């Protein structure tokens, strides 16, 4: 790096020091913080899809069982009991109707020719399909709720063998409408679904404490949203396929902020940094790096206007000091 006879070495030293600090400081949140969104956990999705294989119960061999045997299967452990109790107010009506309306219909044990054993207690239609309110158990997966023509339909609670569960609206045995998804005894998503994918407004929570609030489409973060990091930092703006995309702003915990156009999770195009001490940089970025023309303005009013290539200052530049009315041109090779 060389300079052409700078009139004031203090300005150059200040510029160099500030530029080096900015060049190597971690001003962006690491990519690893952006957790890719997904549809329902595969374990839950598989359990839902393994239901009736689109067959009615009539051609499948089934046996009556006692209420005691059915209840022992349903209440297989304390975890399931606690989950059911959590939604007792919503499930009371369903369980009451099963007890009263279907009192004369015994629970059944179903031998599925495609494998597995199913248990069911509830209503049927004339075709022998599960219809109305009922309780269904298969491979330690439990569904308590409404059925229509052998499909989960309406409000229902689905509990997996591992104790993860979904409570909310169903249509055609898919999560459709508003619902809550719990994993490892913690709420991981609350919001809207379409065909078992997150769609519409929702709130997603992550194991490390991060939270996303905003729009989803096809199971991914798409549209406007807010990603709040566990340390208090946050991103407000647009997303595409679960990455920063479009205009957005990152507000860091210490008070610094980054604002501009993002693409594929990185700053691309016009943007600006504002530090808590009042220092500001405005310029062009490519993949999170300063590229092209930009200007630094320090809190004391001094400024430097110049060019960058991959975060490195090069070429002609102009330093201004409005406090004493001086300015100087420099060349950095």
Residue ranges and their predicted role:
Residues 1-333:
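Intrinsically disordered, low-complexity repeat tracts enriched in Gly/Pro/Ser/Thr and acidic residues
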């Amino acid at each position: 790096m060389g300079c052409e006879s700078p009139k004031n070495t203090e300005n150059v030293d200040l510029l160099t020091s500030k530029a080096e600090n900015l060049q190597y400081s971690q001003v962006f949140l690491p990519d690893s913080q952006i957790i890719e969104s997904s549809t329902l956990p595969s374990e839950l999705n598989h359990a839902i899809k393994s239901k009736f294989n689109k067959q009615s119960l009539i051609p499948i061999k089934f046996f009556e069982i006692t209420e005691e045997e059915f209840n022992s299967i349903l209440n297989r452990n304390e975890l399931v009991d606690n989950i059911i109790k959590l939604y007792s107010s919503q499930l009371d009506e369903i369980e009451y109707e099963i007890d009263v309306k279907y009192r004369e219909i015994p629970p059944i044990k179903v031998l599925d020719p495609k494998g597995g054993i199913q248990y069911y207690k509830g209503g049927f239609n004339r075709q022998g399909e599960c219809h109305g309110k009922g309780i269904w158990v298969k491979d330690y997966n439990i569904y308590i709720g409404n059925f229509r023509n052998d499909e989960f339909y309406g409000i229902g609670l689905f509990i997996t063998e591992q104790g993860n569960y979904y409570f909310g609206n169903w249509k055609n045995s898919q999560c459709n409408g508003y619902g809550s998804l719990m994993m490892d005894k913690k709420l991981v998503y609350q919001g809207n679904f379409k065909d078992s994918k997150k769609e519409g407004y929702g709130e997603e929570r992550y194991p490390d404490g991060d939270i996303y609030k905003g729009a989803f489409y096809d199971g991914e973060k798409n549209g406007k949203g807010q990603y709040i990091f566990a340390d208090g930092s946050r991103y407000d703006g647009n997303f595409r396929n679960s990455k920063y995309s479009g205009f957005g702003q990152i507000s860091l915990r210490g008070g610094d902020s980054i604002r501009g156009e993002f693409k594929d999770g990185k700053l691309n195009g016009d943007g600006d940094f504002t530090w808590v001490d009042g220092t500001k940089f405005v310029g062009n970025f490519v993949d999170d790096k300063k590229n092209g023309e930009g200007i630094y303005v320090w809190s004391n009013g001094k400024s430097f206007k110049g060019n960058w290539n991959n975060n490195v200052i090069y070429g002609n530049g102009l330093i201004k000091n409005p406090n004493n009315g001086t300015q100087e041109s420099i060349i950095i090779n």
